[in-house]
Amino acid sequence: MATNGFRPEYEDLGRYEDILGQLPMLQVYSHIMLPFAMPEGLSRDTIIADLEAAVRQIRAHVPWMAGKVVNVGKGPDNSGRYIVVPCPPPDPLIVVRDVTHAFPPYKEIQRLKAPNSMLDSRLLAPTNAFPQRFEDSEEDPFRVIRLQASFVDGGVFLDFVTQHNMTDAGGLFGFARLVAMAMRGEQFSESLLEQVNRDRRNIIPLLTPDEPMLDHSHHIRPPITDAQPVVRPDPARWHFLRFTAAKLAELKDLASQTMTPDPEVPYITTDDAVSAFCWKKYITVRHRRRNTPDARSRFSRAMDGRKVLGIPAEYMGDLVHNVTTWLTFRELVDLPLGEIARHMRRELNRANTAYHVRSFATFIAQEPDKSTIAYGGRFNPDTDVGSSSVLRVDLFPVFGKLGRPDFIRRPNFPGIPFPSLLYFFPQNPQGDCDSLTCLTDADMEALNQDSEWTSMVEYIG
């Protein structure tokens, strides 16, 4: 019998092995960091106690989050299976650091809007991050969740970390929301636990023999190894940008006004418009250096498959598939913003379907060596852009006595750049969207000298 919504079958860790989480490229950690101002009169000890209580509540109700990930059955031409197994709890449950000596007062961090250059992962993060692979060991297990609280004068940074074979961005944000709920003193409802602990084994119906598989060959790349990572770390740096609510609306209006009528594209979204703007400007500044008008550029968008499969947002497993749009450098330079956004929305409308997700899952399931599969395939950071947007996700909940975070950030991992990657983070309560992008110095300098770019984008750093 269930107690407080918890069911005994949730303790069967075999139910959490899915298909989309089996890619070796996901043998990494994902991070999302939330900075808070310390409320008057609230002690560090109280915050630590509340965070530890929240993690205990999660571990008790979400068994797979209390485990670690291991790879079994790996061999020649076979990448093995990623499964979650029991693991003793860490002691202490969360990492706590006083980093006051290395940071200005939190009010100054607020004033500067928490630029990436300030967010040293060596101080603020408990472990490494994508695209750097993590290897499980007795000394440092590949835990499904980690949490670090880093205190500065007048503030605290909370770094939420999840194992990527077990969760996508929705699952990472779900972990943060569970902590917020627990810190508010809320119990996890039966319906929430049902989705968080949902059996993943058959959540995506694979194609039947009489259903043709779509072409996913663009996801094939050389096998991912330590010597051959997801992308070569060319000289590049991470930067935070801000699109204010007013500029987001302006970009959407501009794109809507310059779009040719298309029966396949009844509308475009703010996400389409801001993605098209970044793609156009990135390639425009590269074209000035390269002068290769016929070169093809690819914009790869990570899409959440939950909606098209009828799966609630609270489900935390990997359900990401990718939608790709191709245009030439000449087209990206010459076409108006609305036409680029129309192309992107058309490809998304065609591919963001249950059949596409089922086909992608079948493609993965049938390939013994999944190290040859990557979202970006043979990604070329000089011509392509890889993007993930969670612009519409709410990630500013109240974390009990701590209140709401001021920003959404990611610790800065300067030694592991991923050039031409672009994240759009959730909009803040004022409607502003902060974006994290990795670009070469040449790209960033050229963009900051582009008047159209600087009129739309606030550079945070």
From Swiss-Prot:
Cell wall biogenesis/degradation is among the record's keywords: no
The keyword Metal-binding is annotated on this UniProt entry: no
Enzyme Commission number: 2.3.1.-
Keywords: Acyltransferase, Transferase
Record pathway: Secondary metabolite biosynthesis
Alphabetical list of Gene3D superfamilies matching this protein: Chloramphenicol acetyltransferase-like domain
Organism domain of life: Eukaryota
Pfam families: TRI-like_N (PF22664)
Gene Ontology molecular function: any one: acyltransferase activity
Entries under InterPro entries matching the protein: CAT-like_dom_sf (IPR023213), Sec_Metabolite_Acyltrans (IPR051283), Tri101-like_N (IPR054710)
Enzyme class: transferase
Function, as annotated: O-acetyltransferase; part of the gene cluster that mediates the biosynthesis of nigerpyrone and its derivatives carbonarone A and pestalamide A. The biosynthesis pathway begins with the polyketide assembly by epaA to form phenylacetyl triketide precursor from successive condensation of two malonyl-CoA, presumably with one phenylacetyl-CoA starter unit produced by the phenylacetyl-CoA ligase epaB. For the nigerpyrone biosynthesis, the reactive polyketide chain is released as an aldehyde through the R-domain. A nonenzymatic cyclization and dehydration may create nigerpyrone.
Family recorded in the similarity comment: Belongs to the trichothecene 3-O-acetyltransferase family.
Record protein name field: O-acetyltransferase epaC
Species: Aspergillus niger (strain ATCC MYA-4892 / CBS 513.88 / FGSC A1513)
Gene behind this protein: epaC
